[in-house]
């Protein structure tokens, strides 16, 4: 096994790095702490690691000081918690002169493939002169349990598929600063493409047929590798049927009871506890996200219906039956993922008389913003419904501003509650920060 690991290490050091489009996210390293990058499969984590490696090389770090392993490599299938020490043994067998004298930069891709990896990384960082970077497709890598097992030696960052601004970077369209008329038209045209293709890097620029095929491949890989195999699911068809129902009902409300009843109607014997587990696993894989009602009572947050969203709006189009999902749902999903990329605490809001606001976002400084999503406000009845609901919520929460995201409309509405900004989706996405300080 040691010879195999040595071979993999040396092979990588001779490999040309494919660094792709530079991501706007920046992982900051802290001395003595592992940097963990987590997110959905095929979302760009490995490519981002190559970008970090390239920056190190450009800064004068020798290629021999880079140790990279992808734990999804079939040749590493036999690695277990009790023999992970072979990695250090293999590396220092190649470069004995570097031990305890030079910093080794370790990149362990998809390390969650080896259960119980945490003590190895913790020990490695305590005993060797190194910097450690990890990637994984499991939100468990954010958990307090891992922080405990790593003795506080880890900092985590989430990576999502391309933001709209990163998509513009891929298209080589300048989007920073004030936009000229020509640049604005280019940005608007690019938004229509982003609307069709979504943010997964691999599908950018592909034909519709190939994009759908690849999205569906992602869908099945996530289900089988991240859920069914990882959790040894005894009734995989129930997981698959549930995933399809949830994608078909993107941006809609659900309850555990309704989902359990749906699976029962298909002949599955999945109790409520199993359905709750499935939902947790979907979220853990960064595939589907649950949004709860905004309420001071945790019990009411849990018992009220919840909304479901997918990691990528275009993936919904590629996977769903198309019967229940409409462009309004897709726009709402797009806005959700843009917000979730920055802010983990997102809820929906219900006014005292039952009017719903799509998103209330809790910022890091505990201030709150309200975001409503509506394709178009041109119909008078729709305009009245959306603005009245937002005004009510603003008044109840003591907020002076609110936002309605549309496909193309742009205006400001002043009423007694405050200012409602109506903004087209492309502008809303550009106005969002790329990271939270």
Put a short name on every predicted segment.
Residues 2, 10, 139, 145-253:
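Interdomain motor-coupling "hinge/lid" segment immediately C-terminal to the ATP-binding subdomain
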Residues 37:
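Hydrophobic anchor at the beta1->P-loop junction of P-loop NTPases
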Residues 45-46:
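Conserved lysine of the Walker
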Residues 58-74:
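Conserved catalytic segments around the Walker B and adjacent sensor/switch elements
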Residues 65, 208-367:
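Accessory nucleic acid-recognition modules appended to NTPase machines
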Residues 69-101:
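Short glycine-rich substrate-engagement loop in P-loop NTPases that contacts/grips substrate
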Residues 407-437:
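Domain-level recognition of nuclease-like catalytic cores that cleave nucleotide substrates
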């Amino acid at each position: 096994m040691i010879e195999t690991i040595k071979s993999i290490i040396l092979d990588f050091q001779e490999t040309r790095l494919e660094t792709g489009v530079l991501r706007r996210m920046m992982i900051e390293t802290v001395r003595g702490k592992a940097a963990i990058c987590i997110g959905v499969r095929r979302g760009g984590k490995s490519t981002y690691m190559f970008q970090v490696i390239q920056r190190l090389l450009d800064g004068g770090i020798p290629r021999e000081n880079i140790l990279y392993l992808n734990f999804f490599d079939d040749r590493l299938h036999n690695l277990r918690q009790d023999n992970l020490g072979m990695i250090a043994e293999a590396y220092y067998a190649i470069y004995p002169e570097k031990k305890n004298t030079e910093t080794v930069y370790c990149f362990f891709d998809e390390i969650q493939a080896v259960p119980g990896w945490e003590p190895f990384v913790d020990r490695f960082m305590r005993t060797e002169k190194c910097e450690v970077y990890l990637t994984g497709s499991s939100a468990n890598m954010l958990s307090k349990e891992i922080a405990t097992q790593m003795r506080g030696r880890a900092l985590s960052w989430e990576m999502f598929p391309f933001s709209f601004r990163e998509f513009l970077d891929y298209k080589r369209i300048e989007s920073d600063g004030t936009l000229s008329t020509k640049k604005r038209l280019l940005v608007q045209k690019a938004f229509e493409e982003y609307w069709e293709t979504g943010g997964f890097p691999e599908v950018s620029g592909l034909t519709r047929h190939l994009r759908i095929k690849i999205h569906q491949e992602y869908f099945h890989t996530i289900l089988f590798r991240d859920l069914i195999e990882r959790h040894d699911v005894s009734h995989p068809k129930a997981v698959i049927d549930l995933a399809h129902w949830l994608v078909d009902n993107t941006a809609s409300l659900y309850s555990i009871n309704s989902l359990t009843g749906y699976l029962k109607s298909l002949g599955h014997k999945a109790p409520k506890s199993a359905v709750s587990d499935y939902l947790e696993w979907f979220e853990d894989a960064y595939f589907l996200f649950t949004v709860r009602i905004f309420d001071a009572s945790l019990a009411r947050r849990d018992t009220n219906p919840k909304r479901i969203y997918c990691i990528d709006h275009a993936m919904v189009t590629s996977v769903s039956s198309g019967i229940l999902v409409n462009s309004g749902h897709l726009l709402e999903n797009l806005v959700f993922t843009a917000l979730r990329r920055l802010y983990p605490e997102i809820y929906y809001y219900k006014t005292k008389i039952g009017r719903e606001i799509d998103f209330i976002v809790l910022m890091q400084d505990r201030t709150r913003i309200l975001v409503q999503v509506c394709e178009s406000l041109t119909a008078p009845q729709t305009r009245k419904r959306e603005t009245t609901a937002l005004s009510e919520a603003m008044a109840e929460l003591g907020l002076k501003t609110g936002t309605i995201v549309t496909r193309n409309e742009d205006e400001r509405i002043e009423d007694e509650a405050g200012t409602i900004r109506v903004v087209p989706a492309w502008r809303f996405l550009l106005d969002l920060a790329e990271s939270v300080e």
